[in-house]
């Protein structure tokens, strides 16, 4: 198998819904965010990423590096109009960051909210074609739809429904 060159840095991408520059102290915000500050001190900070008002299209842009309309995610993944720009999934013709990193030997892991598979395909029985493991990630831990119960979340590890951890 292909392995990254010795000394190749880790790649950590963080996407937070409903968050702006004013929310993070590393960008001058008033909220103290020491862990994000440490990540920002040791890596790159981007200041010009186009986000949409919706989570699925923003995720599609970030993972593909392309406009959300061009990859089939005009709105949240709950909707499939049949038109190419709004299929509720990232088009197969659009490679993801995880697929490209995997091709270069990187191990990839997605954590948290996915919301990039049509709602009818985001259950324990699949189909799994648009789930993280089928879009280039080696591992996944999180919830598939746009929201989950905060006290009794519907959590998945890889492609398998799991019981939430006890708190």
Regions found by a protein language model. Name each.
Residues 1-167:
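Formylglycine-dependent sulfatase
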